[in-house]
């Protein structure tokens, strides 16, 4: 048994992280009894946690059958990338002309921090994911568009897991580092025409890198009817 978890929020945070970082694979079963034993929690508390996970699209509860981790919806992933490409390109075009020296320095520091994590002897994929989010959050925060950012970030069930799958399995971190450097350079040059193609290349990178693995090696991670 793990340490005693006193609240449903603490247990939820652990399971949410494990689902997002694919420690718990899409399609896996989550049974109440093993969870009660693992967390030293009563069944009533575990049921509250599972209900919240279902509300956030991370599990599906079928009465009298059990709870399973949802599979990713490929169509939703595609639409979220399409949406984020349009929104983030506009944010960067608005941000670059008014970026302060302090903001540019913060972006450089976060680009450097991501690269340091990516080149570490032992990679922590959760920290890489978090640092990537912090970098992109910089220009949303600078433009006072945090509602938009939170909306994009709340798409855990599909897009966040897709990003983690890309980060963990494709060996594409050098490409991501180069994308970040190119975005930083465009901000520093205030090259407004560069943002749309750079953002599109960066955000569609996961689909490009995963390629045929989406329909072969990782096909069981996705709802079958949504895989092209």
Task: Describe the role of every protein-language-model region.
Residues 1-98, 212-228:
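Short linear motifs at protein or domain termini
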Residues 26, 164-167:
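Generic structural "secondary-structure junction" signal
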Residues 101-165, 175-189, 194-205:
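Conserved amphipathic alpha-helical segments that form helical-bundle/coiled-coil interaction surfaces
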Residues 168-172:
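Solvent-exposed loop and edge beta-strand segments that line ligand/cofactor-binding
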Residues 204-214:
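Short arginine-rich
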